[in-house]
């Protein structure tokens, strides 16, 4: 089936119980390396078996793949029908793709934010959250994902500011080990109900060990992805 070569897949499938049996949910992505003026993704933190370990500057988690663990039946559910790349695939592969409304409730109620996508987004957010041109180019207010306090590696962030040339400070990779994203069931500060979400903390990119912000991702009741920064 050629569609397997047209989508990229997350490295972390997860099981759900459907009609008394077990099915695995796999997050599938459409990608491109030809999005005009788009910054290429930093993929250095991804697991080696992630489908996103490649050059791209466009990515959308447009499909949820559900695989029956008993008989191997595979269903492709579209959760982002506005994705232009997926729209083209649907014209080619006909009835292979199903609407998200056809997804069993046992599956849709357990969808989670895709881990590999979150790793890429948080790896780049520390610089691109800035909306002031001067701050963006100086890098003085940039953030980085916090390092793992249990790591034996030196350093405190996945990026740091290189001031070798004072006139041209640069954000460069650090060799420390960043905190892995982690899923949790918790209540966000502005809400009354608990949510199942994925999160990651940020510190200043200059190496200070001060919690500056944390980023969370979750899937809402309509299967759409939602990101928040606190």
Question: What would you call each of these model-derived segments?
Answer:
Residues 4-230:
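Soluble extracytoplasmic regions of secretory-pathway and membrane proteins
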């Amino acid at each position: 089936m050629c569609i397997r070569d047209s989508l990229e897949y997350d490295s972390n499938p997860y099981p759900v119980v459907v009609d008394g049996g077990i099915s695995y949910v796999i997050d599938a992505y459409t990608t491109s390396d030809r999005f005009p003026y788009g910054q290429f993704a930093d993929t250095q933190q991804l697991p080696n078996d992630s489908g996103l370990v490649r050059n791209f500057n466009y990515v959308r988690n447009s499909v949820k793949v559900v695989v029956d663990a008993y008989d191997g039946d595979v269903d492709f559910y579209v959760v982002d029908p506005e994705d232009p790349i997926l729209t083209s695939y649907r014209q080619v592969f006909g009835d292979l793709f199903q609407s998200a409304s056809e997804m069993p409730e046992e599956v849709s109620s357990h969808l989670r934010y895709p881990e590999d996508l979150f790793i890429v987004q948080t790896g780049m957010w520390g610089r691109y959250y800035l909306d002031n041109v001067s701050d963006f180019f100086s890098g003085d207010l940039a953030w980085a994902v916090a390092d793992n306090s249990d790591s034996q590696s030196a350093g405190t962030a996945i990026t740091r500011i290189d001031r070798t040339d004072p006139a041209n400070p640069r954000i460069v990779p650090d060799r420390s080990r960043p905190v892995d994203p982690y899923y949790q069931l918790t209540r966000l500060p502005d809400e009354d109900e608990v949510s199942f979400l994925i999160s990651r903390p940020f510190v200043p990119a200059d190496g200070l060990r001060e919690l500056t912000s944390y980023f969370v991702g979750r899937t809402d009741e309509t299967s759409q992805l939602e990101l928040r920064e606190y």
